[in-house]
Amino acid sequence: SSFATNPKRDELITNVKNLIDKPLSDPRKHARAIHNIQGQWQLLDTSSKSASKSQWLNFNELTNKAWESCKEYFEEMKEIKINNARERHKIIEEINNYVMENQKKWPSSKVLVLYLKKMYEKWQNFAPVLDKDLNNLKTLYFASRKPINDAITKQEKINKENKELLILKVNEINDDDNKICIDKFNELKNQWQKIGNAGRKYDNALWSKFNKSADRFFIEKKQAIA
């Protein structure tokens, strides 16, 4: 069995030598190719007799040499990832400061939504980060956004309730003069425009319901003209 695996190990050694002589132009593909060869070598260790010491030392030395061509790339990538983490910490700090400055009197939900969108785009610019930093940064980032998201939810709930009240008021319009009914509806429409967003889930549906509630006035107007 050990004799049968020797040619396979020799083949893997040849493959590593080829990578040293002709490194792949994409450092990530080059790294994956080395990983793949190392994986095959380990598979031979588990399925048959281990390599001889000299064969293992030769393979190990060659794989280390094969790494050289993409080492610089990975070192550069590591620096970029470390810097990205620094920048992301700054963004978290920036959001925390925004919360401190605004939590006594929050801007409108529209302003807050745009602010979070802007910060998210900024956050996305600083990817990737090191695996060891990823979860901690995510936790801190979501924690910093939470007070703003809570403020948006609270405002949208109030806006939803106010819009529902206006729909009820439209339903209550019941004047004999249809023109007065339309004037009253337009007055409520002006009030509606001043209310902020009720949230993506409800806003369009509420607007549609609001207008449908007034359809009866405009149908009557059309009939009067006809």
Each language-model region and where it sits:
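Coiled-coil/CHCH-like alpha-helical segments characteristic
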Residues: 1-226
